[in-house]
């Protein structure tokens, strides 16, 4: 209703000003500004909805204040460009319409009415309401009800008798199981759901709407609110250290806790969270690649669900035979937005909707078949009678190719339980949320019926029942939840552990690299993750007088303040203010001691602007002084004009990537020498090993042969045509996720380059 009202007020404002207000520069500017704000708010809402499927939420607010670059956004570039172009077009059209009758005499009354209507349209818009509530949540000091409803459970279960299998289905919300809306989409898992305790109204709350947040909510009974973007939590060394979560209780009760997934455990700090809360046995992409039957059978995120669930079954079987008490948690990935993935063992690899194939629905149908097969193996085993099986979505689906169809339904998370000891078939329509999942499981296992803000849906009352405005209530508790992290409020002395890649200060530990914004009584950690901007881009958003401590590889800060370290991949510490003085110190000891020293100096805005501009230079445009192309640092030597077909820097060097260009091309500013040696230190990937690799300069071509290990080879070139471009053409680029960033499309790797040097032998 508010959406229609806001649009009506917007149109009324435009019409009244365009046809009645007449000519006045001030009123025109004011009205256009407010109407433009309405347009920006609604485009922001649309864009946020595209990324999150949940409007302008907490994650979007973080992104608006911390620029997002890098991983996982490739498939959203075109929509982003489209939105930007639409914004320019709408502003231009709006200005043209408002000035249609600019030659008419000015009328103050109509101008004022148009401006008030424009202000009303902004105030009534859902986007403004969502942003206002989020900003309020940042300003609050907490909610008195938090202390009333936050409850810490007993640390043990008396006399536990049941093992636990807990399956997180990636984005596998309950809406998919509506057979009227999506006929025969989930027949196998849907049949199992109908055999157990099925909780039909599990809502999603703020801070529980992505994978690690959903896991924290379901095990600790709290949303994932932190002083940094949630997926960046991989940089912390402990995760809600004060909380008692389900894994802690299970471990204290004699359970061996296992977690199995196909993606890398480091992503979003799942390894840190699980290790902090009772899990000693973790298996992700790195751990599984040495045990799975086919290590190359992977999707963009890791191993397919059929592989992961097969390994989970092996773990279940071995643990059951051992007779020890255990919990086995597993997380699928094939239903990850925006498209999903189809494993090769599914019987149904295609699901049509509206008369055409839909990739997301197809992935759901396939993944649920894999999950059902895993559950049926457990049910058919002699150990099911001692087992509780839980199936839940980690969060509602984000904007995938099925999302617009999901939004036409009443959306809820999936949560159902199959008890081998006490079969029970019932659909429970009690209002609840994902924070109640862990407490419900704990209740069944014989423990308390509460964890944090979560309550058992079998014997307690959910906050979703207590508060009609439960979403606003949870946002009001955000400061209370952030305080549970027990983050330090100051930094004076700190220690960098060079070998463990850690920094410690005020009793807290963080993984490197790390950026800290330091103010009175607050230290804000800004980690680097797959979904956050590189730290130098985050630093570029700092105000001129903001104090910072930046711990990163030396070459990343050298271009600004330490040119001598431009090729160093060691750790360095920089601190200061972007508009004032900065220092760079080389970490030259295994345990390096540092102190903060922020000088109260005069702010130089020219210096500030220069620092910001330099920080924002993209990697490929960075240039350094060197007599060779060093591939494990960003950029290229000053002599290089441009290059293509080369992937990002890694610790050892860079791969060629045919997705970025069929050949490696390095164009120099000046012609290469008439006669020179080309010294190449490199290795080959896959079928490119031990095969001739053409290397061209002008009309002359040599061949390079590389093995799987790094070697150095010298080629002799004549360059009579004064060519300035070096071309290397790997013969058989291999599509692979080897070394890839999670969620990125596979790279096509050919050769791995460590260093290329041109040695002039002319004369």
From Swiss-Prot:
Record's bilayer topology term: Multi-pass membrane protein
InterPro entries: Alkaline_phosphatase_core_sf, DUF7024, OpgB, OpgB/LTA_synthase_biosynth, Sulfatase_N
Membrane-spanning intervals of the chain: 1-21, 26-46, 77-97, 108-128
A Pfam family annotated for this UniProt entry: DUF7024
Regions annotated as coiled coil: none
EC nos: 2.7.8.20
Chief localization: membrane
Pathway it works in: Glycan metabolism; osmoregulated periplasmic glucan (OPG) biosynthesis
Keywords: Cell inner membrane, Cell membrane, Membrane, Transferase, Transmembrane, Transmembrane helix
Reaction it catalyzes: a phosphatidylglycerol + a membrane-derived-oligosaccharide D-glucose = a 1,2-diacyl-sn-glycerol + a membrane-derived-oligosaccharide 6-(glycerophospho)-D-glucose
Gene Ontology biological process terms from the UniProt entry: glucan biosynthetic process
Subcellular location, record wording: Cell inner membrane
Cellular component GO terms, alphabetical: plasma membrane
GO molecular function, one term: phosphatidylglycerol-membrane-oligosaccharide glycerophosphotransferase activity
Entry keyword Transmembrane helix: yes
Family: Belongs to the OpgB family.
Chain's role: Transfers a phosphoglycerol residue from phosphatidylglycerol to the membrane-bound nascent glucan backbones.
Protein name as catalogued: Phosphoglycerol transferase I
Biological source species: Salmonella schwarzengrund (strain CVM19633)
